[in-house]
């Protein structure tokens, strides 16, 4: 499951546009919008520090939140945010309204485990990561936090495909082909022969 949900307080904003957005930012607020679920969009302002903390904590785009706007609570999933390219602060956030049966498309990070059990890595092979994240369809209330990719037994030349990853029943990849997530390749200087021999003897 994704990270534990959290709550943010916001205020509805009547004025929109660049001038209004600049004024909000000067006052420590970020302009944002809540949309979707067949309801009218709501322009809101949220606390800059609270949102920045959530973004930097990780999992921001895959964690469902509750935003309270003038006493009414909205269950949402962040869909996009804009950062200032120079000063690296948040300029705007888009939130999608969700309910328990809402299907969402999210990018889930992959974690590699059991590196020490990979013969290819033991002899100096390099893990070449093709995809750091996998885009999937899933219910809003069942977003995985990450996918574990097991490297046990993987040798130089081996590839890890999405078909080797155990996905929850309600989660399906956006791409329907059996795409590659990572490969184990020989190092630029070649394989350490003594290490390879030792590994071969250990397997014998």
Swiss-Prot record:
Molecular function per GO: 5S rRNA binding; structural constituent of ribosome
Domain of life (superkingdom): Bacteria
Gene Ontology process terms (BP): translation
Keyword check for Ribosomal protein: yes
GO cellular component, one term: cytosolic large ribosomal subunit
Keyword terms: Ribonucleoprotein, Ribosomal protein, RNA-binding, rRNA-binding
Pfam family membership, one: Ribosomal_TL5_C
Similarity comment: family membership: Belongs to the bacterial ribosomal protein bL25 family. CTC subfamily.
Self-association and partners: Part of the 50S ribosomal subunit; part of the 5S rRNA/L5/L18/L25 subcomplex. Contacts the 5S rRNA. Binds to the 5S rRNA independently of L5 and L18.
Main function: This is one of the proteins that binds to the 5S RNA in the ribosome where it forms part of the central protuberance.
Name of the protein this chain belongs to: Large ribosomal subunit protein bL25
Species this protein is from: Rhizobium etli (strain ATCC 51251 / DSM 11541 / JCM 21823 / NBRC 15573 / CFN 42)
UniProt lineage: Bacteria, Pseudomonadati, Pseudomonadota, Alphaproteobacteria, Hyphomicrobiales
Gene: rplY
